[in-house]
């Protein structure tokens, strides 16, 4: 399951997160409870939250 989780997170990072980087900066990850300095960092946390929960 953990390997699958990592693969899913990687796919999300490559496909969704890069396209959504501008939106991540705009909302500053407040919906996820995180305040990030970089869209990439913000995005990683979003993807892992989706994967874990």
Swiss-Prot record:
GO terms, molecular function: toxin activity
Cell compartments where the protein resides: Secreted
Key words, A-Z: Disulfide bond, Knottin, Neurotoxin, Secreted, Signal, Toxin
Signal peptide bounds: 1-24
Main location: secreted
Distribution of this protein across tissues and organs: Expressed by the venom duct.
GO cellular component: extracellular region
Disulfide linkage: 29-43, 36-47, 42-51
Source organism, top-level taxon: Eukaryota
Protein task: Probable neurotoxin.
The name this protein goes by in its record: Conotoxin Cal6.31
Source species of the chain: Californiconus californicus (California cone)
